[in-house]
Curated annotation (Swiss-Prot):
Name of this protein: Small ribosomal subunit protein uS9
Coiled coil: none
Gene name, Swiss-Prot/TrEMBL: rpsI
HAMAP family per record: Ribosomal_uS9_B
Biological processes, Gene Ontology terms: translation
Lineage top rank: taxon: Bacteria
The organism of origin for this protein: Campylobacter lari (strain RM2100 / D67 / ATCC BAA-1060)
Keywords linked to the UniProt accession: Ribonucleoprotein, Ribosomal protein
Endoplasmic reticulum is among the record's keywords: no
Length: 129
């Protein structure tokens, strides 16, 4: 089976993902997934969720590069990229991933700061007198 490429995004993080048949190795930014995450098990479960849903955790090799955002946003971008790559490999995978919401881009981003305000919504302190 050929290598499939997809991109995933979350906030300002972007993940470029290459998926191919293999033994279940996941390499992110040249490091093993566990090394890259530094032992964050909750985030690891988030990343491998598309593989668990499609039951491909031991039959797909994944190579990915991530940039922008923090660890959590990069992990969710990686999950989105893996989901999109799997969906383009097999239509049956798409039918499994779509109901779980794994193919949907989470469009929530930081609200911009407005002038006359301290933050996006925080106003300066009001003094009555």
């Amino acid at each position: 089976m050929a290598t499939t490429y997809a991109t995933g995004k979350r906030k300002t993080a972007v993940a470029k993902v290459w998926v191919k048949s293999g033994s279940g190795k996941i390499i992110v930014n040249g490091m093993d997934l566990n090394t890259w995450l530094g032992g964050h098990e909750a985030i690891k479960l988030k990343v491998v969720q598309p593989l668990l849903v499609t039951k491909q955790e031991t039959s797909m090799d994944i190579k990915a590069t991530t940039l922008g955002g923090g660890y959590s946003a990069q992990a969710e971008a990686l999950r989105h990229g893996i989901s999109r790559a799997l969906a383009s490999m097999d239509a049956d995978f798409r039918a499994l991933l779509k109901p779980k919401g794994l193919l949907t881009r989470d469009s929530r981003t930081v609200e911009r700061k407005k002038y006359g305000r301290r933050k996006a919504r925080r106003s300066p302190q009001f003094s009555k007198r």
